Amino acid sequence: MATIQAFWRFSRPHTIIGTTLSVWAVYLLTILGDGNSVNSPASLDLVFGAWLACLLGNVYIVGLNQLWDVDIDRINKPNLPLANGDFSIAQGRWIVGLCGVASLAIAWGLGLWLGLTVGISLIIGTAYSVPPVRLKRFSLLAALCILTVRGIVVNLGLFLFFRIGLGYPPTLITPIWVLTLFILVFTVAIAIFKDVPDMEGDRQFKIQTLTLQIGKQNVFRGTLILLTGCYLAMAIWGLWAAMPLNTAFLIVSHLCLLALLWWRSRDVHLESKTEIASFYQFIWKLFFLEYLLYPLALWLPNFSNTIF
Protein backbone atom coordinates (compact mmCIF):
# COMPACT_ATOMS: atom_id res chain seq x y z
CA MET A 1 0.00 0.00 0.00
CA ALA A 2 2.82 2.41 0.84
CA THR A 3 4.42 1.73 -2.55
CA ILE A 4 1.14 2.42 -4.35
CA GLN A 5 0.70 5.68 -2.46
CA ALA A 6 4.26 6.70 -3.30
CA PHE A 7 3.71 5.88 -6.98
CA TRP A 8 0.52 7.97 -6.96
CA ARG A 9 2.47 10.95 -5.61
CA PHE A 10 5.26 10.25 -8.10
CA SER A 11 2.73 10.44 -10.96
CA ARG A 12 1.58 13.93 -9.81
CA PRO A 13 -2.18 13.26 -9.42
CA HIS A 14 -3.36 16.63 -10.74
CA THR A 15 -1.60 15.97 -14.04
CA ILE A 16 -3.02 12.44 -14.23
CA ILE A 17 -6.54 13.79 -13.73
CA GLY A 18 -5.94 16.50 -16.32
CA THR A 19 -4.65 13.97 -18.85
CA THR A 20 -7.58 11.64 -18.22
CA LEU A 21 -10.17 14.36 -18.69
CA SER A 22 -8.48 15.72 -21.80
CA VAL A 23 -8.46 12.30 -23.51
CA TRP A 24 -12.11 11.60 -22.78
CA ALA A 25 -13.29 15.13 -23.54
CA VAL A 26 -11.59 15.16 -26.93
CA TYR A 27 -13.06 11.75 -27.65
CA LEU A 28 -16.55 13.02 -26.83
CA LEU A 29 -16.04 16.06 -29.04
CA THR A 30 -15.15 13.68 -31.86
CA ILE A 31 -18.34 11.64 -31.64
CA LEU A 32 -20.83 14.37 -30.69
CA GLY A 33 -23.24 14.96 -33.53
CA ASP A 34 -21.68 12.31 -35.78
CA GLY A 35 -24.00 9.52 -34.76
CA ASN A 36 -21.31 7.13 -33.62
CA SER A 37 -22.07 4.92 -30.67
CA VAL A 38 -20.02 5.64 -27.59
CA ASN A 39 -20.40 2.00 -26.61
CA SER A 40 -19.19 0.39 -29.83
CA PRO A 41 -16.20 -1.92 -29.20
CA ALA A 42 -14.10 -0.21 -31.88
CA SER A 43 -14.52 3.24 -30.40
CA LEU A 44 -13.86 2.05 -26.84
CA ASP A 45 -10.68 0.27 -27.93
CA LEU A 46 -9.46 3.55 -29.40
CA VAL A 47 -10.18 5.68 -26.36
CA PHE A 48 -8.91 3.20 -23.76
CA GLY A 49 -5.74 2.63 -25.75
CA ALA A 50 -5.14 6.35 -26.13
CA TRP A 51 -5.90 6.89 -22.45
CA LEU A 52 -3.35 4.27 -21.36
CA ALA A 53 -0.66 5.59 -23.71
CA CYS A 54 -1.19 9.16 -22.51
CA LEU A 55 -1.18 8.18 -18.83
CA LEU A 56 2.10 6.31 -19.23
CA GLY A 57 3.55 9.26 -21.12
CA ASN A 58 2.37 11.55 -18.33
CA VAL A 59 4.22 9.48 -15.72
CA TYR A 60 7.35 9.54 -17.90
CA ILE A 61 7.31 13.34 -18.18
CA VAL A 62 6.61 14.16 -14.53
CA GLY A 63 8.91 11.38 -13.32
CA LEU A 64 11.78 12.55 -15.50
CA ASN A 65 11.36 16.04 -14.09
CA GLN A 66 11.61 14.68 -10.55
CA LEU A 67 14.76 12.71 -11.39
CA TRP A 68 16.53 15.90 -12.41
CA ASP A 69 14.98 18.06 -9.68
CA VAL A 70 15.64 15.96 -6.58
CA ASP A 71 17.70 18.62 -4.81
CA ILE A 72 15.25 21.38 -5.71
CA ASP A 73 12.27 19.26 -4.65
CA ARG A 74 13.82 18.65 -1.24
CA ILE A 75 13.22 22.37 -0.71
CA ASN A 76 10.10 23.06 -2.78
CA LYS A 77 8.22 19.73 -2.71
CA PRO A 78 9.64 17.54 0.08
CA ASN A 79 6.61 15.22 -0.03
CA LEU A 80 7.56 13.81 -3.44
CA PRO A 81 8.84 10.20 -3.22
CA LEU A 82 12.30 10.81 -4.72
CA ALA A 83 12.84 13.88 -2.58
CA ASN A 84 11.86 12.18 0.68
CA GLY A 85 13.44 8.79 -0.07
CA ASP A 86 10.29 6.69 -0.56
CA PHE A 87 11.72 5.78 -3.97
CA SER A 88 15.40 5.48 -4.78
CA ILE A 89 16.87 7.17 -7.84
CA ALA A 90 17.29 3.75 -9.44
CA GLN A 91 13.63 2.93 -8.87
CA GLY A 92 12.64 6.28 -10.34
CA ARG A 93 14.72 5.60 -13.44
CA TRP A 94 13.12 2.21 -13.94
CA ILE A 95 9.62 3.64 -13.62
CA VAL A 96 10.36 6.48 -16.03
CA GLY A 97 12.07 4.22 -18.56
CA LEU A 98 9.37 1.56 -18.56
CA CYS A 99 6.55 4.09 -18.78
CA GLY A 100 8.24 5.93 -21.63
CA VAL A 101 8.85 2.80 -23.70
CA ALA A 102 5.37 1.39 -23.03
CA SER A 103 3.73 4.71 -23.87
CA LEU A 104 5.46 4.94 -27.25
CA ALA A 105 4.85 1.27 -28.06
CA ILE A 106 1.12 1.50 -27.38
CA ALA A 107 0.74 4.84 -29.16
CA TRP A 108 2.55 3.85 -32.35
CA GLY A 109 0.77 0.50 -32.31
CA LEU A 110 -2.59 2.25 -32.41
CA GLY A 111 -1.87 4.75 -35.15
CA LEU A 112 0.22 7.52 -36.65
CA TRP A 113 -1.52 10.47 -35.02
CA LEU A 114 -1.45 8.98 -31.53
CA GLY A 115 2.19 8.04 -32.04
CA LEU A 116 3.02 11.59 -33.09
CA THR A 117 1.00 13.07 -30.22
CA VAL A 118 2.73 10.98 -27.56
CA GLY A 119 6.14 11.13 -29.24
CA ILE A 120 6.17 14.92 -29.55
CA SER A 121 4.90 15.27 -25.97
CA LEU A 122 7.70 13.05 -24.65
CA ILE A 123 10.35 14.89 -26.67
CA ILE A 124 9.18 18.25 -25.32
CA GLY A 125 8.91 16.83 -21.79
CA THR A 126 12.47 15.55 -22.04
CA ALA A 127 13.78 18.86 -23.34
CA TYR A 128 11.96 20.60 -20.49
CA SER A 129 13.80 18.70 -17.75
CA VAL A 130 17.04 17.14 -19.00
CA PRO A 131 20.41 18.92 -19.38
CA PRO A 132 22.01 20.31 -21.37
CA VAL A 133 18.78 21.66 -22.88
CA ARG A 134 16.68 21.86 -19.67
CA LEU A 135 14.25 24.47 -20.95
CA LYS A 136 12.66 24.87 -17.53
CA ARG A 137 15.58 27.16 -16.63
CA PHE A 138 14.03 29.86 -18.80
CA SER A 139 10.56 31.15 -17.95
CA LEU A 140 9.37 31.83 -21.49
CA LEU A 141 10.61 28.52 -22.90
CA ALA A 142 9.25 26.60 -19.91
CA ALA A 143 5.80 28.11 -20.41
CA LEU A 144 6.04 27.41 -24.14
CA CYS A 145 6.73 23.72 -23.44
CA ILE A 146 3.71 23.37 -21.18
CA LEU A 147 1.24 25.22 -23.40
CA THR A 148 2.48 23.41 -26.52
CA VAL A 149 1.85 19.98 -25.03
CA ARG A 150 -1.28 20.65 -22.98
CA GLY A 151 -2.79 23.30 -25.22
CA ILE A 152 -1.97 22.19 -28.76
CA VAL A 153 -0.39 18.76 -29.21
CA VAL A 154 -2.71 16.77 -26.95
CA ASN A 155 -6.00 18.33 -28.06
CA LEU A 156 -5.40 18.49 -31.80
CA GLY A 157 -3.38 15.27 -32.03
CA LEU A 158 -5.92 13.20 -30.12
CA PHE A 159 -8.79 14.71 -32.09
CA LEU A 160 -7.23 13.74 -35.41
CA PHE A 161 -6.42 10.27 -34.07
CA PHE A 162 -10.02 9.71 -32.98
CA ARG A 163 -11.46 11.19 -36.19
CA ILE A 164 -9.43 8.89 -38.42
CA GLY A 165 -9.94 5.88 -36.15
CA LEU A 166 -13.71 6.35 -36.23
CA GLY A 167 -13.79 6.78 -39.99
CA TYR A 168 -14.33 10.54 -40.18
CA PRO A 169 -12.39 12.94 -42.42
CA PRO A 170 -9.16 14.17 -40.74
CA THR A 171 -10.44 17.72 -40.37
CA LEU A 172 -10.28 20.07 -37.39
CA ILE A 173 -13.79 21.37 -36.80
CA THR A 174 -14.92 24.43 -34.84
CA PRO A 175 -15.60 22.74 -31.46
CA ILE A 176 -12.02 21.45 -31.12
CA TRP A 177 -10.54 24.79 -32.17
CA VAL A 178 -12.57 26.59 -29.50
CA LEU A 179 -11.53 24.14 -26.79
CA THR A 180 -7.91 24.27 -27.92
CA LEU A 181 -7.75 28.07 -27.81
CA PHE A 182 -9.37 28.15 -24.36
CA ILE A 183 -7.00 25.49 -22.99
CA LEU A 184 -4.03 27.16 -24.67
CA VAL A 185 -4.52 30.44 -22.82
CA PHE A 186 -5.56 28.66 -19.62
CA THR A 187 -2.35 26.63 -19.75
CA VAL A 188 -0.32 29.83 -20.05
CA ALA A 189 -1.88 30.91 -16.75
CA ILE A 190 -0.99 27.57 -15.15
CA ALA A 191 2.54 27.73 -16.55
CA ILE A 192 3.31 31.18 -15.15
CA PHE A 193 1.68 30.56 -11.76
CA LYS A 194 3.15 27.10 -11.12
CA ASP A 195 6.47 28.48 -9.90
CA VAL A 196 5.06 30.98 -7.40
CA PRO A 197 5.12 28.45 -4.51
CA ASP A 198 8.65 27.36 -5.47
CA MET A 199 10.55 30.63 -5.27
CA GLU A 200 12.96 29.54 -2.54
CA GLY A 201 14.33 26.48 -4.31
CA ASP A 202 14.28 28.09 -7.77
CA ARG A 203 16.29 31.06 -6.52
CA GLN A 204 18.83 28.83 -4.82
CA PHE A 205 19.34 26.69 -7.95
CA LYS A 206 19.22 29.64 -10.38
CA ILE A 207 16.03 28.63 -12.21
CA GLN A 208 14.96 31.89 -13.88
CA THR A 209 11.20 31.73 -13.43
CA LEU A 210 8.88 34.59 -14.25
CA THR A 211 8.04 34.85 -10.56
CA LEU A 212 11.66 35.66 -9.71
CA GLN A 213 11.89 38.13 -12.59
CA ILE A 214 8.76 40.23 -12.04
CA GLY A 215 7.56 39.24 -8.55
CA LYS A 216 4.76 37.00 -7.34
CA GLN A 217 2.22 39.84 -7.05
CA ASN A 218 2.52 40.63 -10.76
CA VAL A 219 2.38 36.95 -11.68
CA PHE A 220 -0.74 36.55 -9.53
CA ARG A 221 -2.45 39.48 -11.24
CA GLY A 222 -1.41 38.28 -14.67
CA THR A 223 -2.83 34.84 -13.94
CA LEU A 224 -6.18 36.31 -12.93
CA ILE A 225 -6.29 38.47 -16.07
CA LEU A 226 -5.57 35.51 -18.35
CA LEU A 227 -8.18 33.30 -16.71
CA THR A 228 -10.74 36.09 -16.75
CA GLY A 229 -10.13 36.54 -20.46
CA CYS A 230 -10.67 32.81 -21.03
CA TYR A 231 -14.04 32.74 -19.31
CA LEU A 232 -15.33 35.96 -20.84
CA ALA A 233 -14.23 34.89 -24.31
CA MET A 234 -16.00 31.54 -23.97
CA ALA A 235 -19.19 33.22 -22.75
CA ILE A 236 -19.13 35.72 -25.63
CA TRP A 237 -18.48 32.94 -28.14
CA GLY A 238 -21.51 31.11 -26.78
CA LEU A 239 -23.72 34.02 -27.84
CA TRP A 240 -22.56 33.86 -31.46
CA ALA A 241 -21.77 30.18 -31.99
CA ALA A 242 -23.36 28.92 -35.21
CA MET A 243 -23.62 25.30 -34.09
CA PRO A 244 -25.80 23.09 -31.86
CA LEU A 245 -25.03 24.29 -28.37
CA ASN A 246 -26.76 24.82 -25.05
CA THR A 247 -25.95 28.52 -24.96
CA ALA A 248 -27.48 29.23 -21.56
CA PHE A 249 -25.56 26.41 -19.90
CA LEU A 250 -22.26 27.42 -21.52
CA ILE A 251 -22.56 31.10 -20.59
CA VAL A 252 -23.92 30.67 -17.06
CA SER A 253 -21.44 27.93 -16.12
CA HIS A 254 -18.43 29.95 -17.30
CA LEU A 255 -19.57 33.18 -15.66
CA CYS A 256 -20.16 31.28 -12.41
CA LEU A 257 -16.65 29.86 -12.54
CA LEU A 258 -15.28 33.33 -13.24
CA ALA A 259 -17.08 34.66 -10.17
CA LEU A 260 -15.77 31.72 -8.12
CA LEU A 261 -12.23 32.43 -9.33
CA TRP A 262 -12.31 36.04 -8.14
CA TRP A 263 -14.04 35.12 -4.87
CA ARG A 264 -11.40 32.47 -4.21
CA SER A 265 -8.54 34.84 -5.11
CA ARG A 266 -9.49 37.23 -2.29
CA ASP A 267 -8.34 34.71 0.32
CA VAL A 268 -4.85 34.22 -1.08
CA HIS A 269 -2.02 35.70 0.98
CA LEU A 270 1.04 35.66 -1.22
CA GLU A 271 3.37 35.40 1.77
CA SER A 272 1.87 32.02 2.64
CA LYS A 273 3.32 29.16 0.61
CA THR A 274 0.45 26.93 1.73
CA GLU A 275 -2.21 29.33 0.45
CA ILE A 276 -0.38 29.86 -2.84
CA ALA A 277 -0.11 26.10 -3.38
CA SER A 278 -3.79 25.70 -2.52
CA PHE A 279 -4.77 28.34 -5.07
CA TYR A 280 -2.59 26.66 -7.68
CA GLN A 281 -4.48 23.40 -7.10
CA PHE A 282 -7.74 25.35 -7.36
CA ILE A 283 -6.68 26.60 -10.81
CA TRP A 284 -6.09 22.99 -11.82
CA LYS A 285 -9.61 22.12 -10.64
CA LEU A 286 -10.96 24.85 -12.94
CA PHE A 287 -8.88 23.31 -15.72
CA PHE A 288 -10.48 19.92 -15.01
CA LEU A 289 -13.96 21.42 -15.06
CA GLU A 290 -13.52 22.86 -18.55
CA TYR A 291 -13.01 19.40 -19.96
CA LEU A 292 -16.34 18.44 -18.38
CA LEU A 293 -18.42 21.55 -19.02
CA TYR A 294 -17.53 22.20 -22.65
CA PRO A 295 -18.47 18.74 -24.01
CA LEU A 296 -21.56 18.83 -21.80
CA ALA A 297 -22.67 22.13 -23.38
CA LEU A 298 -22.36 20.50 -26.80
CA TRP A 299 -24.07 17.29 -25.70
CA LEU A 300 -27.10 18.83 -23.96
CA PRO A 301 -28.85 19.95 -27.21
CA ASN A 302 -28.46 16.43 -28.62
CA PHE A 303 -29.70 14.91 -25.39
CA SER A 304 -32.76 17.17 -25.30
CA ASN A 305 -33.54 16.31 -28.91
CA THR A 306 -33.58 12.59 -28.11
CA ILE A 307 -35.87 13.21 -25.13
CA PHE A 308 -38.34 15.47 -26.89
Swiss-Prot record:
Write out the entry's keywords from A to Z.
Membrane, Transferase, Transmembrane, Transmembrane helix
Knockout consequence? Impaired in biosynthesis of alpha-tocopherol.
EC number(s) recorded for this UniProt protein = 2.5.1.115
- Is the keyword Transmembrane helix assigned to this protein? yes
One GO BP annotation of this record: vitamin E biosynthetic process
tRNA processing listed as a keyword: no
**Main subcellular location:** membrane
Q: Where is the signal peptide?
A: none
The record's catalysed reaction(s) read: phytyl diphosphate + homogentisate + H(+) = 2-methyl-6-phytyl-1,4-benzene-1,4-diol + CO2 + diphosphate
Q: Which Gene3D superfamilies match?
A: UbiA prenyltransferase
Topology versus the membrane: Multi-pass membrane protein
Q: Which cysteines are joined by disulfide bonds?
A: none
Q: What class of enzyme is it?
A: transferase
Protein localization: Membrane
GO molecular function terms listed in the Swiss-Prot or TrEMBL record:
homogentisate phytyltransferase activity; prenyltransferase activity
Q: Could you name the Gene Ontology cellular component terms for this entry?
A: membrane
CDD domains in UniProt: PT_UbiA_HPT1
* Job of this protein: Involved in the synthesis of tocopherol (vitamin E). Catalyzes the condensation of homogentisate and phytyl diphosphate to form dimethylphytylhydrquinone.
The UniProt entry's sequence similarity note says: Belongs to the UbiA prenyltransferase family.
What's the protein called, per UniProt? Answer: Homogentisate phytyltransferase
